[in-house]
Amino acid sequence: MTTSATAPALLALQQACATVGLDPSTAVPVRIAENQIWRLPGGVIVRIARPGQAAAARREVRVAQWLAASGVRAVRPIDVQQPVEADGRPVTFWGELPAHEHGTETDVALLLRQLHALPKPDFDLGYLDPFVRVGERLQAATTLNEDDRRWLHELHQGLAVAWEKRPAGLPECVIHGDGWPGNLVRTATGRVMMDLERMSVGPPEWDLVSTAVRMTTTGAVPREQYATFCDAYGIDVTTWPGYRTLAGARELRMVTYAAQHAASNPEWAAQAQHRVDCLRGRRGPRPWNWKGIM
């Protein structure tokens, strides 16, 4: 099925599948966002990344292979030479997971604890950039007025300074980078890690902040569930002196992600503006009710 949203990646899908000997004629779109995800018959998932992301795609495949060798359950690349460059975009091929659902807070905590305990691999993962693509997203956020965009730019600059001066925390390690229940899922046979593109070396608090923000900022996680997360991991990151800096970076990313996509998806404009209004103190104190953006 081809729509106006899926059409830009269709040529890449066809070219990449031809390169590795797969048939894309009955491919079905699974998720159309910054990266496009397609399903092929036979349990193959095709991931079409943005142009210019070939190095990241190669690293993601290598990370998956390293996790498999380390005993961590995660998505697995299929046995073809990849990534494939097609129509200027890197394309990777993965084994489809069995039926699964979002992980619980305990699932997330236990997978993160297992990951954080691993020794660093013998290849370069790169160091965490907590503000990756924030500037690009702000530039694309055309539904916001100039005053709001200027304020967000200033917030970005202030948080970048605070990040460099953040207090010491836990020892740095391999981190997932986007550790929320949609990426750390549960199948009938156990917990599985997905979406490996943001894995890097950095402070483990960055992974823990994702769940904490869902309690303190968006209100998606009740305090009782957050307490189970802390018990399972062994630490409450909200008590760390650097929490507000990392939480602020997470909030900024969530706002700019929504604002960027509102420019091409008008139905998200109200939510993007709502998030900006919350940060600017126009919607009362945290937690706020932020709806998901796909």
Label each region the model flagged.
Residues R133, L138-L144, E224, T256-M294:
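ATP/Mg2+ or Mg2+-diphosphate-binding catalytic cores
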Residues M1-P24, R150, H274-M294:
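Regulatory N- and C-terminal appendages and interdomain linkers associated
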Residues E34, L40-G43, A86-P90, A249:
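A short, glycine/Asx- and small/polar-enriched loop/turn
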Residues T6-L13, K120-G177, G234, R286, ...:
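An alpha-helical support segment within catalytic cores of ATP-dependent transferases
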Residues E205-T238, A249-P266:
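Active-site activation/catalytic loop segments of kinase-like enzymes and analogous catalytic loops
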Residues R31-V46, P77, A160-L208:
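Active-site acidic catalytic loop and adjacent metal/ATP-binding pocket
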Residues L10, R47-D87, P98-A117:
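A conserved alpha-helical element in kinase catalytic cores
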Residues G95:
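Conserved Hanks-type protein kinase catalytic core
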